[in-house]
Amino acid sequence: MRCSVTKFFCSTAKKSQMVERVKDYMYKNDKLFELLDARILEMKEGYAKVEMVVKKEHLNAANVCHGGIIFSLADLAFALASNSHGKLALAIEVSITYMKAAYEGEKLVAEAKEVNLGNKTATYLMEVKNSANKLIALAKGTVYRVNEDFPPTS
């Protein structure tokens, strides 16, 4: 009994360390964080939450947040969640539906949740909400899980 409890805690600690390594690596190396001025709010295996504030440079010709910016925020959460297992995950399909416009000055939060984890593929649902907790966009993405450690060790 004692051995299995120790194994559980060791395994949980290793998973937590892996998530932190992925989080740190992605934040430092994915230039989209800097471009969007986005930050990671929360991350664990199969889950991530990121936020940004809509700025003037994020607006389209209709003076609302460009759909590509909203998609990019959802994609950041998707990338974090899908790579959180320490195995390189590359998007093979992503779709998004926009529900509501976002405006300059609004805080947007994207949350990615794992709905299926297989050996080769995994699927995630992403929601983007504003500070009033209104749904701005809903996305679904699938990744191919490459047989490579992530982040790279070298």
Swiss-Prot record:
Organism superkingdom: Archaea
Keyword DNA-binding: no
SUPFAM superfamilies (UniProt xref): Thioesterase/thiol ester dehydrase-isomerase
Enzyme Commission (EC) number: 3.1.2.-
Keywords: Hydrolase
Top EC class, one word: hydrolase
UniProt GO MF annotations: acyl-CoA hydrolase activity
Pfam families attached to this UniProt entry: 4HBT
InterPro entries found in the cross-reference section: Acyl-CoA_thioesterase_PaaI (IPR052723), HotDog_dom_sf (IPR029069), PaaD (IPR011973), PAAI_dom (IPR003736), Thioestr_dom (IPR006683)
Similarity section: Belongs to the thioesterase PaaI family.
UniProt name for this protein: Putative esterase AF_2264
Organism: Archaeoglobus fulgidus (strain ATCC 49558 / DSM 4304 / JCM 9628 / NBRC 100126 / VC-16)
Lineage: Archaea, Methanobacteriati, Methanobacteriota, Archaeoglobi, Archaeoglobales
